[in-house]
Amino acid sequence: MKLIPDDNWRWYFDADQARLMLDLANGMTFRSRFSATMLTPDAFNPSDFCVEDAALFFTYQEKCLTLNIDAQAKAELVLNALVANRFLKPLMPKSWHFAALGHGEYCPQLGELVWVRLNERLEDACFMVVDTGDKASLCLLAQAELALSGKVMVLGEAIKIMHDRLCPVDEGADHAQSSLHFAHAG
C-alpha cells in the first residue's frame, strides 16, 4: 500500500500508549517511535497534517527510494522523520560514536541519505537527515539496526551528528556499499 497524504490526516497524542499518532483517515493509524519525554509541547495538542508536513513527506519519501528496505519500513522511516522534524525536542550531538571523515564544510540537505563510520569497529551505517543545523544535523537510522556502544539502535531512531562525521551516500556508495545495502537500478 502506498501512502498519499490528504486533508483528513490528523496528528494526536495517545496518552495510553504515550506516543504521538497520525490518523491516516482510512482506518489506519501510525504510531511514532518517540516517547512522550522526547516530544515538544506542540505534540500533545491535536493538529491537522498541514501543507508543510505533506511537502516534507514527499521530500523524505523521494530520498529513501534507493534504500533496500521494504515498503512498510520506508513508510515507517518517512513518518518518523516527519515526527522528528516537527515534534522532537532538540538533541545534543553524539558524534563521538563516529569517525571524523574530513569533509570540511559539508552541510547535508534535508532528507539526504548519509553514511558514517563507527569508531568502535570498522563498520559504516546509513542515516537520513531530517533536520539540518549549522554544524550538526538530526538524523534517523535508515537501516534495520545498528549496534552502538552496547545499545542497539533500530530503524527510525534519532541521533544528532556533527557534519564532519557525515558523508553523502552518493559520494561514498562504492566505499560503503557492503554495509549500506542500497537498491540498484538496472
Swiss-Prot record:
The keyword Cell division applies. InterPro entries: ZapC, ZapC_C, ZapC_N. Keywords: Cell cycle, Cell division, Cytoplasm, Septation. This is Cell division protein ZapC. The keyword Phosphoprotein does not apply. Belongs to the ZapC family. It comes from the Bacteria. Signal peptide: none annotated. Interacts directly with FtsZ. One of its GO terms (cellular component) is cytoplasm. One of its GO terms (biological process) is FtsZ-dependent cytokinesis. It is found in: Cytoplasm.
